[in-house]
Amino acid sequence: MAVKPSANLGKAFQLPHPFNSCVYIQIPPQPTWSINEYWERNPNKQYLDESDTTYLEELTLTPIEKHQALEKLNTIISAADRLQEVDTKNVDPMYTCVDEREMYMNSGQDGETVNKEEILGNAHKIFQDYFTAPTSEKMRSSSDLNAKE
């Protein structure tokens, strides 16, 4: 079934074959909302500051331009905050976001299990019973991070 263009939206265009006979995509001529307008309407949103970007820089071992990173991350956070506006009270949770095919749950039958010591035996370094990955020099020098013997 073809979707006809709406008068209040921009021009519609057809997708290339084989979709051109049944699908239209409508693109508004102008953005329908702005992050800045959303921020003004939602004063209780969370922001990141420079100390957060310093911490992220240490975790990733990658130098970042703090001002630019703050702008981008705060924009992403505020965009994600829009999800709070969606009313999901009467919506059943999904087991998967893939709805093109059925996804079956595990039957609950126990299979072969491996104990924690056997799993951690493969770790190069262990921190509080977890595998660790290389991180910043500040974290590597921490007395809590002990190399496996």
Swiss-Prot record:
Entry's Gene Ontology molecular function annotations: ATP binding; glutaminyl-tRNA synthase (glutamine-hydrolyzing) activity
Domain of life where this protein originates: Eukaryota
Swiss-Prot/TrEMBL GO biological process terms: glutaminyl-tRNAGln biosynthesis via transamidation; mitochondrial translation; regulation of translational fidelity
Residue stretches spanning the membrane: none
EC number: 6.3.5.-
Compartmental location: Mitochondrion
Family matches, as Pfam families: GatC (PF02686)
A GO CC term attached to the entry: glutamyl-tRNA(Gln) amidotransferase complex
UniProt entry tagged with the keyword ATP-binding: yes
Function: Allows the formation of correctly charged Gln-tRNA(Gln) through the transamidation of misacylated Glu-tRNA(Gln) in the mitochondria. The reaction takes place in the presence of glutamine and ATP through an activated gamma-phospho-Glu-tRNA(Gln).
Additional note from the record: This protein may be expected to contain an N-terminal transit peptide but none has been predicted.
HAMAP family documented for this protein: GatC
Family: Belongs to the GatC family.
Protein name per UniProt: Glutamyl-tRNA(Gln) amidotransferase subunit C, mitochondrial
Origin species: Trichoplax adhaerens
